[in-house]
UniProtKB/Swiss-Prot annotation:
Coiled coil regions, renumbered to chain: none
Organism name: Xenopus tropicalis (Western clawed frog)
Residue intervals annotated with topology Extracellular: 71-76, 132-250, 295-306, 385-406
Listed name of the protein: Vacuole membrane protein 1
Cellular component per GO, a single term: endoplasmic reticulum membrane
Catalytic activity: a 1,2-diacyl-sn-glycero-3-phospho-L-serine(in) = a 1,2-diacyl-sn-glycero-3-phospho-L-serine(out); cholesterol(in) = cholesterol(out); a 1,2-diacyl-sn-glycero-3-phosphocholine(in) = a 1,2-diacyl-sn-glycero-3-phosphocholine(out); a 1,2-diacyl-sn-glycero-3-phosphoethanolamine(in) = a 1,2-diacyl-sn-glycero-3-phosphoethanolamine(out)
Biological process per Gene Ontology, one example term: lipoprotein transport
Protein localization: Endoplasmic reticulum-Golgi intermediate compartment membrane; Cell membrane; Vacuole membrane; Endoplasmic reticulum membrane
Length: 406
């Protein structure tokens, strides 16, 4: 009797396990489960669940630090070599001598390049939201240089305070000496570094898709899962967005280097798909990154620079301000702050340290500064939410694995 009872219990457990495994193998069940899990993760944000979000964020940070510590330990010889190199550079940096002028020059250029590369990476990677650093930093910088160049008739701004502050040089430039190419050359370094940063930011989708294809293991990345689903239903795609994505995928897959170059050179929101496509179809790294770097850091950046420089050239700006005044009823009142802002900028360009009281701040510049602060603050919040949701995904995957083994 006892043996029969034991056999019945084993059969009951086995049947339950088979039924459970069958549920997990059902595509509709898995799809519904993924949808529920995704909705649950998306609800973990600071303004809905602040305590859980902060807790998950801290745990995800600790896990990330642990993973990086393990990776660095496995590459300890390289870490030691880098530390020795930094020690030698520190000695060279702090020892007095005639070489200090070159050290200061290299330090200034390296920090300047690193700043713009970092902003480019932030703009490209985004971590869930994207910090549009071209609109917030590079675009206004190019616009300021353009306005200053036409006002000063020169781009030889005193260093310092340039690039932190732009003032006209002591010697007056010749009227009409400024050309489009002069301004392009002045801002070429920072623009190319920003473009290189955006190219570097496109690498994570490429490496993720490539690793998933080579390993044959189903990835947990939602964008890659959507890409595979799009390929499966390519023949039945009806909506414009899906057809546009398929067009980008076909261009990159069939044309190769030139197709990637074309996608990277033209501002478009679908280039992330190009990185996933290249990784999925095992496009060589240097083919993908080389085309992306040339397209974003050279071709696309020159297009964007030309647009900003032409838009903020002296006669265009004056025409735009005059056109604002033509707007019925609100035109004159709306035109006044723009005129005051431009006049304040002209005075600031000719302002010297010993020229009296500082200039009063215009409300347009004040509003733009507050907009930048709000955007950066929102970006930080999005990072916290994104990392908290990443930890929630770990918890869901762990729970799913336990359920599969029952």
């Amino acid at each position: 009797m006892a043996e029969n009872g034991t056999d019945c219990e084993q059969r009951r457990v086995g049947m339950a396990k088979e039924q459970n495994n069958g549920s997990f193998q059902d595509p509709s069940f898995l799809s519904d489960r993924k949808s529920r899990d995704r909705e649950e993760r998306q609800s973990i944000v600071l303004w809905r669940k602040p305590l859980i979000t902060l807790q998950y964020f801290i745990l995800e940070v600790l896990i990330t630090l642990k993973d990086w510590s393990i990776r660095l330990w496995h590459r300890r010889m390289m870490v030691v070599s880098v530390l020795l190199l930094l020690a030698v550079l520190s000695v060279v940096y702090y020892i007095e001598g005639t070489h200090q002028q070159y050290v200061q020059y290299v330090e200034k250029k390296c920090l300047w390049c690193a700043y713009w590369v970092g902003l480019g990476i932030l703009s490209s990677v985004g971590l869930g939201t994207g910090l549009h650093t071209f609109l917030l930093y590079l675009g206004p910088h190019i616009a300021s240089v353009t306005i200053a160049a036409y006002e000063c008739n020169s781009v030889n701004f005193p260093e310092p305070p340039y690039p932190d502050e732009i003032i006209c040089p002591d010697e007056e430039g010749t009227e009409g000496a400024i050309s489009l190419w002069t301004i392009i050359s002045k801002v070429r370094l920072e623009a190319c570094m920003w473009g290189a940063g955006t190219a570097i930011g496109e690498l994570p989708p490429y490496f993720m898709a490539r690793a998933a294809r080579l390993s044959g293991v189903e990835t947990d990345d939602e964008e890659y899962a959507e890409f595979e689903e799009m390929l499966e239903h390519a023949q039945t795609a009806q909506d414009f967005a899906t057809r546009a994505k398929l067009a980008v995928q076909n261009l990159v897959q069939k044309v190769g280097f030139l197709g990637i170059l074309a996608c990277a050179s033209i501002p478009n929101p679908l280039f992330d798909l190009a990185g996933i496509t290249c990784g999925h179809f095992l496009v060589p790294f240097w083919t993908f990154f080389g085309a992306t770097l040339i397209g974003k850091a050279i071709i696309k950046m020159h297009i964007q620079k030309l647009f900003v420089i032409i838009t903020f050239s002296k006669h265009i700006v004056e025409q735009m301000v005059s056109l604002i005044g033509v707007i019925p009823s609100i035109g004159p009142s709306l035109q006044k702050p723009f005129q005051e802002y431009l006049e304040a900028q002209r005075k600031k360009l000719h302002h010297k340290e010993d020229s009296g009281a500082p200039q009063s701040e215009n409300w347009l510049s004040w509003a733009f500064e507050k907009l930048v602060i709000i955007m950066v603050f929102y970006f930080i919040l999005s990072i916290i939410n994104s990392m908290a949701q990443s930890y929630a995904k770990r918890v869901q995957q762990r729970k799913l694995s336990v359920e599969k083994t029952k």
